[in-house]
């Protein structure tokens, strides 16, 4: 969330999306509150995301570079967006203007609050006094240990986006099937399993977490949960995590923004944690 990023002193650039041909900023719901956005989508509004442009990246970084600062930029996963490529091209261009400054672009290989969890960890390292180069090395290794598993109770937009076939979507709706998905090692999204009902989907996500988390059931680091207009489901995930992994006391629930939400629609809950091993 915007408040969380500000509390960690993390600077950010807005993503873009189109709603019925109108260009909008993904500005934490100020332009379109999530509930309104999903209502419009369900009513048939045309929605699509567009990546941050090279010019937008350069305009975002330039003030910091002019102040004599170096820039370490973490991008949304290249597995779900072309924005990493834009950032890399912007880096090449702006380096010509600021040859004495360091500019590094890192592919988070994550989305939503998984992307956020990596940036949060990086902010911790910055506050611990890591040098620029040490922070880059840390982030490139750490990104492989952020796990993200999620499920959805509404398959409409997964079908629309081609992630699930129409037949599977129809059957899934009739049989109350929730696809359980993850963020793969290459940063793309994949359907891993299918659960009958959200209770089983929630249980499976928490089970995977206990199997893969740093120190297993003794995991005591942060957990980030994102949801698209299904706060009670996110709360149910949080409660089960607290029951199964009692050492955790820092579980944050966030709202899925438009950049991811236009692909998932309402009814999606995503859970992110630090893993013991890199994602396979």
What are these regions (language model features)?
Residues 42-78, 85, 89, 136:
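Glycine-rich phosphate- or other oxyanion-binding loops that anchor nucleotides, phosphorylated ligands
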Residues 31-38, 61, 65-66, 93:
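A short glycine/small-residue-enriched secondary-structure motif
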Residues 1-56:
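N-terminal glycine-rich anion-binding loop in soluble enzyme alpha/beta folds
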Residues 1-21, 72, 79-83, 87-92, ...:
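Mixed-charge interfacial surface used for oligomerization/domain docking
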